[in-house]
Amino acid sequence: MKKLVSILSLILVSAALLAQTPTGGVTGAVVSRAGRLPIPGANLIIQKDGQTVATSTSASDGRFLVEALADGMYQMTITADGYKDLRVNVTVDNGFVKDMIFMTMTPDVQVESVDASNFTEFDMDDSGYNDNPTILFSSNDPYNSVAGYGFSSIRFKNRGYNSETQDVYFSGVRLNDAITGYSPYSLWTGLNEVTRSKETSTGLESSDYGSGGYNGSTNIFGNPSNVRKGLRASVLTNSAMYRLRLMLTYGSGPLDNGWSYAVSASARVGGNDWIKGVYYRSFAYYLGAEKKFGDGKTLALMHFATPGQRGAQNASTQEVYDLMGDNMYNSNWGYQNGKVRNSRVRKTFEPVTVLRYRYAPSANFESNTIFLWRTGFNGYTALDWYDASDPRPDYYRNLPSYSFANSTEGDDQSARYDYSYDDLSKKGQLMYEAWTSRSSDYLMYQHLNWDRLYNVNYNSADGRSKYAQEQRHVDQNDLNLVENIKWRINDYSVLSGGVNFKYNRTEYYKKIADLLGGEYFLNVDSFAERDFAINEAKIQNDLDYYIANGFKSEKITKGGKYGYDYFANVIKANLWAGYNLQKDNWDIKVSGNVGYESFWREGMMRKGLFAGTEGEVAELNRKLPATQQLKAVLDADGNAVTSKGKSETKHFLTGSAKAYLSRSFKGGHRVYANLGVFSDAPTFNEAFISPRTRNTIIGNLRNKFTYSADLNYQYSNKGYNVRFTAFYTKIKNQSDVMSFYDDSQNSFTNFAMTGIDQQHLGIEFGFSVPLPVTGLSLEGVLSAGEYTYTSNPYMVQTIDNSAEVVRQSTVPYWSKVPLYATYEDAAGMTQFDMDGDGNMIVKGYKKHYVPSTPQIAAQLGLKYNINYWFLELNAQCFAKSHLDMNPLYRTDFACKGCFDENGNLIYNEDVNKGGSAHFYYMTDQEEFKPVFLLNASVGKSWYINNNQLGFSLQVNNITNNRGVKTGGYEQTRLQNSSSKDVYYRFQSKYFYMSGINYMLNVYFRF
């Protein structure tokens, strides 16, 4: 009996002890990677040793809680519609509930929500003024989802930044152009299905594939396994870009044997309803295969390209648009044999090959090794002429404003845009009649006269073409090698990093595309011939050929290179690292990189103007006739200016540091901040004064420094979505180079500026609010900023033919223009007020703004999404867009006649008589009128036996507003008055947005 009692007591004590064994759990919030927005309805599965021990579902705010877990290691899998599965290891210790803070999920192409980005399948390329996305990604963020696509037609720049500040990756390799820094949209345009799956970071946020900059980054996965499984076909037509797009894509998805493969092809053909001469004849293809091995290794091979051609649009002056009665006028085309022919056609074929090796032995570690090669050609045709009149129909001498009555030719023309018929001379009136007539008899005057160009060449006695069509080439060979790692150290911290190497060798040259009826084109410098006609050696574009072939200029036939030929060589190496800590509702990230960049020019032609060093020129002179002797050209430092061979190599150290701090609160509130400092090397295009002709690099070339910060508040709960951001960015020590014909020098010149500073500050606000009607929501976005120039850069102007420096000084009215106080004197005349020292009193300044983007952009709309129907109606407002400035107009030289001998501004209200009126006429920056637009879209999809049929229709600019300027520039030329007392501007040139336009897409998924 005692034994029985003892046994029962032991059992009861053991049971009590067992009941008291500590149990814990796991909690956190499931959020999207872009914007940290909550993901409701996500499914969580907790497993131990392959057996499911618990399940849960995230709430409306993304929160989840799994309890009653014994101490130990668990595997947690999270799945959600539209996102990639997430698998992590979780350790429960001492009965505590483990807080995972944020479980971030990456969007997946496998399941698509019905939203605007699916319906509006934008084609992204470098066409300049078409409807390309302004932010390369869209997301659930209430601001980015609108700004990413909805503002693209107006050329909106996110926070006023140029596109080169946004990092674009393909399969983990940064693809921004090595020469210019710009995002290479044209490499994958037309491959929408393949590039749909992407990962994004916004603003200063870092990523898993690089430390990034201050304008966000996008990584297009591109792997075959990321392409949506099944077959998709689509047919699209639109009225603003091209007539027809056909697209076919197939993805196998991951197969049982570990293989995945995908293929895609598309064609875009035809013109549009608005801009004559603009057309597409472009194609695209993608081939990809991927093998997943059983030990965590994956190997993928991808190849894609977008061969094709498209006709381009040209900007024109408002005078031309008004004469034609059409803001969509395009001066690039004319009729040839009854067919439209565009003189400016871009032809491209730049295939990209990617080999990627991924090693992920566990859920906590991943490494990726990627090799990417970009090659091919990119050509752009244009007219060239020699010893002949300018063939462009909108050339200023062909316009009525060139011939006023009772004035000397060239007098006051640019100041008189609003002339009447009676103001014109007889010649000007004939021009006016020719431009305004709608008779077919004047088509050859209003557009390119191809027949005249051919006839001029036919009548050439020796077969030499006076007119030809050139093709300017930028042919890249771009090699990239990348190694990235990601290591989850524990449940709340992740370390990532990598090494990137790039070598780019790009050939710049031009060749003859069409001799236009002639037999050859002479390879000489027409500008040099005007100045140095007595020395034939000096005008040669290829002096070595001239000497080797009996002192005869090279005759170029179709396909031959001429004019210039050089290589731009760029090397970039970068080491980056990032650390992310998520604990107790805090999220902390720090990242940074250090890098090295170098570049040099390598000339392939010896130009007679810059034949070489003193020793090289001495050797050449021994071969040249006595009447054609040359001299070495020396720069201001006594160094020889050369054209052939390697230039000096410039070396730069680069780097950045970034920090991110976030605090989440109950109820879906989050506050976060970013801070970043960047030191970037200038690009090749910003460094060389005239790479077409010589090896000279601009002086005082230094790194560009950027300081950026933002503060954010976000609320996301129960369908409500709000984000508010305040940002500030300072960019210092930028450089810029341009070349243009300077009438004051009667020569083609180069203009280099250094020390350009900018300041960008503003706010972003976005919201999405559900309305009482199921599926209906109110959405709004506001971007309000001030993007200004804050320095007066230093400029050096040189003659292109001689490298002679003709001007060097600051550009005193680049960043702002002083506004002076005035008073009325005893005679009732207005005068400038002076202080006690005799200086004019400044009452304020008129700022100059970063151009070609609205500083204020807003949208308010209704969105209805239910039962696979999608409808959206939105109104947009854009304001404070400004014209791109010509720095020459902001120099003291261009403002001559405005100041007295003491340097004080002369008060004058007549713009044609110098003084203050003329000063403000020369220095003011044009601001475009505010714009109001109305857009709508509708879409529907049906599921039939797991197959999908759908359509989408988008209509933009419903009010048919044809007066919307999207950009433009001041011409880089000056006109003298007949008295030579003052200079005048040339008329500015503009681009306009098309009127009402549509895009209709029908798609099938099997």
Q: Language model features by range: what are they?
A:
Residues 24-25, 237-270, 274-313, 343-364, ...:
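Transmembrane beta-barrel wall of Gram-negative outer-membrane proteins
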Residues 330-352, 356, 639, 643-650, ...:
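Outer-membrane beta-barrel signature, preferentially recognizing the C-terminal barrel domain
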